[in-house]
């Protein structure tokens, strides 16, 4: 495409006398054959016979730039040093090749050059005479993609290679140039079409546009690198004026073409740097904004999260429903950490806020229902009170145990939060001494219920904390309605011991045994100012129980039948200590000394209770059964 515009200038060149053209041919051939004008004189004579062909062939060399000729000359560059001698020997073959071109008609050249085979053969043969065209790209370096691949190869180092290829095989090489030249405009059309296509889709796909102008620049850079030696390598001093004129005119044509026809690649070429910079800036800005949106909402979330968690923690501390809300909070935190997009973060934040607002009224409703359920449980004294996890600040025995169970369950599920919660609950318990006193008075009941609640560790800690405290405050805070649940619990305990221990308790006997051993070791530690009445009876019953339990151990080791008989015998003596304790409780709420008595009587009862339960469950744990027996004896 770009060569058609430069062709009409050549008829003007035909007006020059043929002498100048022959000078051009001789100078070019001198460049090719390393200074052998003798062999070339015959050629020059032949060109004098038909001057038109020489002129046209020398002027059609602009169109010889095709990828195939580029490849041929590039192949020749590798062995271009020894081409001079070969050219000398094969001069007559070149003459025969020129006769082939002379027989072809010339007048089709101003038209389409891609389809004219005669023009193509002439161009390919006289390709060494492209010296005047070598100045064009050097003077006009900014050639577009369409004209770039064409004019690069016609440099002076490439002249001998083209000559060498045309000389040995005249017949087969003659038809090949039309294909090459047909490909050159086809590539130009492809470049133009692709450039237009990508120009239309430049907004959609900026990456291919950027990649294509890069290729264009890559093709132009080696051209300019090869053009630099091309300027001094043209020893055409004879026809310098005509060469300059032709090169200027052709350069103008090529420039007009480069801005008109292949102007498409130049527009993306100019925009090539801009879209990259803009894209990088946009990408960086978008990435930074994305990270900002990622970072800033998360920071606000992390700032808001502690508040929410504090509020929910306060609610859960007040309500006793620690485990469920903690799990929901931890899940919410984990989900919020996993969120990547700010929109999702906002939606999930709204969701979790709604959930928190829903949780707080439900917990308050649970509080009310627990308070409502609390009075009949207090009267009944059932062990189901462990399920009501929300006690008022002066709680009776079952609700304090329920709180302990809630702590125990919250601890293993969420360890770090559970530790924080544990400390808070322990502080609250230390503040409310009534609850602690209840826990101490409850110790027999809790030892019975340890299988269900599994709060042995906390009860032991509370008993440790409450032992050094003065008993006057506890006696003052004791109220008369607390007698009834203690009595009810003792009665239930006696009934349970008579009926036997259920399987769930049997599975958890080991925990309870550890608890009983610890409590037995700790309860006899305070001084023992025991009055003669109830405490001695309790100790007698406990010692008798211990002896029986030791006997039972030997019996169980011997045979299981004896164990069954002794289990049948035991319920009667185990009913006795609850009644004794009930009498002690009825008599002893008036003075602190009697409260101490009750505490030690409970300790003795614990001593008797541990081995009895172990024998009932038929689970022998030696340290629990043997240790307390030795101490009691």
UniProtKB/Swiss-Prot annotation:
One term of GO molecular function: protein homodimerization activity
Positions of region (Interacts with DYNLL1 AND DYNLL2): 614-633
InterPro entries membership: NABC1
Tissues where this protein is expressed: Highly expressed in the brain and, more specifically, in oligodendrocytes. Expressed in the Schwann cells (at protein level).
Record-level GO BP terms: myelination
Composition bias, Polar residues: 24-34, 57-68, 278-288, 359-378, 510-522
Recorded GO CC terms: cytoplasm; cytosol
Subunit annotation: Homodimer. Interacts with DYNLL1 and DYNLL2.
PANTHER family noted in UniProt: BREAST CARCINOMA-AMPLIFIED SEQUENCE 1
Function: Required for myelination.
Name listed for the protein in its UniProt record: Breast carcinoma-amplified sequence 1 homolog
Organism: Mus musculus
Record lineage: Eukaryota, Metazoa, Chordata, Craniata, Vertebrata
């Amino acid at each position: 495409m770009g060569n058609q515009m430069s062709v009409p200038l050549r008829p003007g060149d035909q007006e020059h006398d043929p002498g100048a053209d022959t000078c051009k041919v001789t100078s070019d051939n001198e460049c090719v054959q390393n200074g052998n004008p003798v062999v070339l004189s015959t050629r020059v004579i032949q060109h004098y016979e038909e001057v038109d062909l020489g002129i046209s062939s020398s002027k059609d060399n602009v169109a010889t730039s095709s990828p195939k000729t580029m490849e041929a000359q590039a192949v020749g560059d590798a062995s271009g040093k020894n081409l001079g001698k070969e050219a000398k020997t094969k001069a007559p073959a070149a003459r025969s090749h020129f006769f082939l071109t002379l027989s072809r008609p010339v007048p089709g050249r101003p038209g389409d050059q891609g389809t004219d085979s005669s023009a193509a053969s002439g161009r390919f043969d006289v390709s060494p005479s492209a010296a005047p065209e070598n100045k064009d790209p050097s003077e006009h370096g900014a050639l577009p993609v369409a004209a770039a691949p064409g004019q690069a190869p016609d440099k002076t180092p490439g002249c001998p290679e083209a000559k060498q290829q045309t000389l040995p095989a005249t017949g087969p090489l003659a038809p090949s140039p039309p294909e090459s030249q047909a490909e050159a405009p086809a590539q130009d059309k492809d470049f133009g079409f692709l450039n237009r296509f990508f120009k239309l889709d430049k907004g959609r796909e900026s990456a291919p546009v950027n990649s294509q102008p890069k290729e264009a620049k890559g093709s132009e850079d080696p051209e300019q690198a090869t053009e630099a030696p091309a300027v001094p390598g043209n020893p055409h001093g004879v026809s310098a004026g005509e060469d300059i004129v032709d090169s200027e005119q052709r350069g103008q044509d090529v420039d007009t073409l480069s801005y008109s026809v292949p102007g498409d690649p130049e527009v993306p070429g100019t925009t090539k740097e801009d879209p990259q910079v803009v894209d990088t800036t946009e990408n960086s800005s978008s990435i930074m904004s994305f990270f900002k949106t990622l970072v800033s909402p998360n920071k606000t979330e992390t700032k808001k999260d502690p508040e929410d968690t504090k509020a929910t923690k306060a609610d859960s501390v007040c309500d006793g429903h620690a485990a469920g809300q903690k799990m929901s909070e931890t899940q919410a935190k984990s989900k919020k950490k996993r969120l990547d997009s700010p929109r999702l973060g906002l939606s999930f934040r709204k969701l979790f806020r709604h959930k928190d607002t829903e949780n707080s009224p439900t917990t308050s409703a649970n509080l009310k229902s627990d308070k409502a359920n609390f009075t009949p449980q207090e009267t009944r004294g059932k062990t189901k009170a462990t399920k009501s996890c929300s006690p008022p600040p002066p709680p009776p025995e079952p609700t304090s145990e329920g709180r302990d169970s809630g702590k125990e369950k919250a601890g293993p599920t969420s360890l770090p939060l559970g530790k924080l919660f544990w400390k808070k609950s322990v502080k609250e318990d230390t503040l409310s001494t009534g609850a602690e006193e209840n826990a101490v008075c409850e110790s027999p009941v809790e030892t019975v219920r340890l299988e269900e609640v599994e709060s042995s560790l906390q009860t032991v800690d509370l008993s440790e904390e409450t032992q050094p405290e003065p008993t006057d405050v506890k006696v003052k805070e004791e109220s008369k309605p607390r007698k009834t649940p203690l009595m009810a619990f003792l009665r239930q305990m006696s009934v349970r011991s008579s009926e036997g221990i259920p399987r769930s308790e049997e599975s958890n006997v080991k925990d309870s045994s550890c608890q009983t051993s610890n409590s037995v070791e700790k309860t006899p530690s305070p001084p023992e100012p025991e009055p003669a009445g109830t405490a001695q009876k309790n100790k007698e019953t406990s010692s008798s129980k211990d002896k029986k339990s030791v006997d039972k151990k030997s019996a169980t080791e011997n045979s299981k039948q004896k164990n069954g008989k002794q289990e049948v015998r035991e319920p009667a003596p185990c009913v006795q200590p609850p009644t004794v304790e009930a009498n002690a409780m009825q008599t002893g709420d008036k003075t602190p000394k009697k409260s101490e008595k009750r505490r030690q009587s409970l300790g003795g009862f614990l001593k008797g209770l541990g081995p009895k339960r172990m024998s009932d469950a038929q689970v022998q744990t030696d340290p629990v059964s043997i240790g307390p027996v030795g101490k009691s004896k």
